[in-house]
Amino acid sequence: MSGKRKRVVLTIKDKLDIIKKLEDGGSSKQLAVIYGIGETTVRDIRKNKEKIITYASSSDSTSLLAKRKSMKPSMYEELDKAMLEWFNQQRAKGNPISGPICAKRAEFFFYALGMDGDFNPSAGWLTRFKQRHSIREINIRNERLNGDETAVEDFCNNFRDFIEQENLQPEQIYNADETGLFWKCLPSRTTVIKGKCTVPGHNLGEERITVMCCTNATGLHKLKLCVVGKARKPRSFKSTDTLNLPVSYFSQKGAWMDLSIFRQWFDKIFVPQVREYLRSKGLQEKAVLLLDNSPTHPNENVLRSDDGQIFAKYLPPNVASLIQPLGQGVIAAMKRNYRAGLLHNNLEEGNDLKSFWKKLTLLDALYEIAMAWNLVKPVTISRAWKQILPAIEEKEGLDFDEDISGATVATILQHTKGLENVTPENLEKWLEIDSTEPGYEVLTDSEIIRRAQGQTDESSENDEERIELIPEKHINHTTALQWTENLLDYLEQQGDMILPDRLVIRKLRATIRNKQKMTNPGQ
């Protein structure tokens, strides 16, 4: 007679590990045996996957997740949600958060949410709040966080010790950071104001996307940009497969990065591509991803490969703005490249600015921003790591060209009809218009309250649905083949077209013919 199975209570970390194994094809039966639990428990974990991941992602401490065994909700659940949202935003900004500040804010949200009863934001409440969300520490002394040079030095020293201990090379050290991009904003002769564009009555927010850059410390492995737009399939994509885009494209109703998208990107894109790159360099498949404390970045325990060899590490809130590598001119260089590219394209097409603006699509912007990222030189990136890794070497043979300057863009403007007289001040405003745009949604107190109460912005969802209903244009093989024939005829007539260009089109024609034969064998 078999003995009764001993009751096993899993930690949150155990549940996360089980979820990862399930996503990788592990069976409920096998996992039940490994963890000494019933298959029903495994199925319950699968059922509550998103809830567990969301809870873990919002936690502040990996070590506490390894101890915590329940996700017991607060007695005041709406207040708890509002406080966590507020806390994460304050931490991301590097603002000081003390016990008294938390207590005062909790009292404000309690009454703003219209909650009943007596509420005392005591030290006991604060302790329970921290425990529920695995928050390591709250700065009780209310010290100033921004601009803390001592904290910068401490972090850099600790990080270098960590790198040495883990035996990591610069090739294995990565940074990722998000930014907002007003992709359709063009300069005006008179002014460039945040929220307005050159077309009267047009709101910049309607053409805002989130762009995330990721690269290693040498600048020799730049991953494809991760872009978040509002629609799952924007109209300009037509029948384009998103897998064939020059960026990794995701959608979110506000075009913001969120916890779910970041986790997908880490698991499905970052980890596999880093493994492939390190393998090609003959290096151990081990890497660290350095991140700031954005509310959209999950807990370190969530951002970890199955074998634990590729993982995330966080910059302290009080130093991120000072030393995060991509924030040291790298993202700014990419944006300047992008805007210079837009003006150059307009100049080449010879259109007036308004016509160019109307024709500019999100698909055009994705190709342009991908090119702009490609133009950022490895040496520009490696120099941005100097404060954290002063010993990093600049690779020989890499020429360093100064990033595109305002003067360079001004030269292009002088040849752009309608923009010849843009003032240097307005030009600089345009170039810097989204320099402080975060990649995550910053909520006001009233928005935090609505979200805590479960209210959503239905208009955004309806807008996305309306975009999705636009029919796609289908191009058949016969039509595509005719276009390539016409293009080849055109190239043959041009005496200055080089042979490689014609060969590319001929190869494309052969590919289309093969597709046509496979679809219609009788032709």
Curated annotation (Swiss-Prot):
Pfam families: CENP-B_N, DDE_1, HTH_Tnp_Tc5. Residues 168-385 form the DDE-1 domain. Residues 28-48, 100-132 bind DNA. The keyword Nucleus applies. It is found in: Nucleus. The keyword Nucleus applies. Keywords: DNA-binding, Nucleus. SUPFAM superfamilies: Homeodomain-like. Residues 1-52 form the HTH psq-type domain. One of its GO terms (molecular function) is DNA binding. PANTHER family: JERKY PROTEIN HOMOLOG-LIKE (PTHR19303:SF16), TRANSPOSON (PTHR19303). Belongs to the tigger transposable element derived protein family. This is Jerky protein homolog-like. It comes from Mus musculus.
